[in-house]
Amino acid sequence: QDDRSGWQAEDQIAVEYLEACKEAVASDEAFANFKSNPKYKTILEHVLKDQGQAYLNICKDMNEDAVWENIEAFKENDKIGNPELYPYPGMKGTISPTTLRYMKNTFEMAFMLDGAEISKVVEVGGGYGGLCRVLSKVCEFDEYVLIDLPEVSALQRKYLDQFPDLKDKVTCIPCTEYEEIKD
């Protein structure tokens, strides 16, 4: 019996995810809808509506004023890729649960940093760059480095290039090409 039998489905999911990334880079039509592509959603963009509510509640518990002051800026993450959007109590319009997760990550980072300045962020395995986009709305970093698989890195570049305020601050490095990252 093949010892890998339990991994075959997971291998196929990974292959389909990378195919979806390549399609989104090669085709503007695929890019316009990549967040709702079933092949992409097996790995990313699959946060459930109720999980989004839990993330929003955590953010409000941490700093409710900052949530409402920045919510429209955070929603910019949802303007590209056609994600699933939902209404949430107390919020105008809709937002994707994945963006709410990135908000939670951002608020947790702000809490841990306790007001410290950050000039450089390095993220390994950054998906399409959503955390980078959301974090950029409340953190004045000089440089953000994303390291990922080559297919994903190309999607990050295409996605983040859509935002002029990030284009020159972000470096997307395929994991097959990186060298030592210097301070």
Predicted regions located by residue number:
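Class I SAM-dependent methyltransferase SAM/SAH-binding core
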Residues: D142-K167
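Conserved SAM-binding loop of SAM-dependent methyltransferases across substrates and taxa
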Residues: Y128-E140
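Conserved class I S-adenosyl-L-methionine
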Residues: E117-G127
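Short, catalytically relevant binding-site loops at active-site mouths
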Residues: L44-E45, Y128-G130, E151-A154, E177-E180
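Intrinsically disordered, low-structural-confidence terminal and linker regions
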Residues: Q1-D2
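S-adenosyl-L-methionine
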Residues: K158-K182
